[in-house]
A protein has these predicted regions:
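Short hydrophobic-acidic sequence motifs that mark active-site Asp/Glu residues
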Residues: 6, 54, 120
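Core segments of cupin and vicinal oxygen chelate
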Residues: 1, 8-52
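Vicinal oxygen chelate
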Residues: 9, 23, 30-32, 87-131
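Conserved hydrophobic/aromatic beta-strand scaffold that supports enzyme active sites
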Residues: 38-40, 77, 110-112
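A general marker of short, structured functional hotspots
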Residues: 2-3, 16-17, 21, 34, ...
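Conserved, structured core segments of small domains
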Residues: 14, 25, 42-79, 84, ...
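N-terminal beta-strand motif that seeds the catalytic metal site of vicinal oxygen chelate
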Residues: 1-19, 73-78, 125-131
Length: 131
């Protein structure tokens, strides 16, 4: 079976995107390339045993989707310890709720957000008591 091993975030304003994801999730952004500008997106420490993947950040090559337009991309979902706490961080950092928190019964809490660049991403809090 083939696995996802990398993701990319496109941004109109790269500094704003790095600040958003750094403030909300604590991610780090080492510069990988000068031209075209490309940053890594480190979602865990280098030797972490946590499951997950790292990605990249690049300049958006075309206009962002308009509000209300469907997403024409894969959506990455971030596992968190406390959904409500992360929601507050997202909103404080300039993100918006795209689909409010809902239960995946017996499994988790799930919801979707827009970052400062208009990208959709999910948030997932495991909870076997969710209903």
């Amino acid at each position: 079976m083939n696995r996802v091993v990398h993701f990319e975030i496109q941004a109109e304003n790269l500094e704003r995107a790095m600040k958003f994801y750094g403030d909300v999730f604590g991610w780090q952004f080492p510069k990988w390339m000068e031209e075209p500008p490309y940053w890594g997106v480190m979602t865990a420490e280098k030797d972490s045993k946590e499951p997950g993947i790292n990605g990249g950040l690049l300049q958006r090559p075309c206009p962002a989707p308009t509000i209300g337009q469907g997403t024409n991309a894969f959506i990455c979902t971030v596992q968190v310890e406390n959904f409500d706490e992360i929601t507050k961080k997202i909103e404080t950092a300039g993100g918006k709720v795209a689909m409010p928190k809902f239960a995946l019964p017996g499994m988790a809490w799930q919801g979707y957000f827009l970052d400062t660049e208009g990208n959709t991403f999910g948030v997932h809090q495991a909870d076997k008591n969710a209903k």
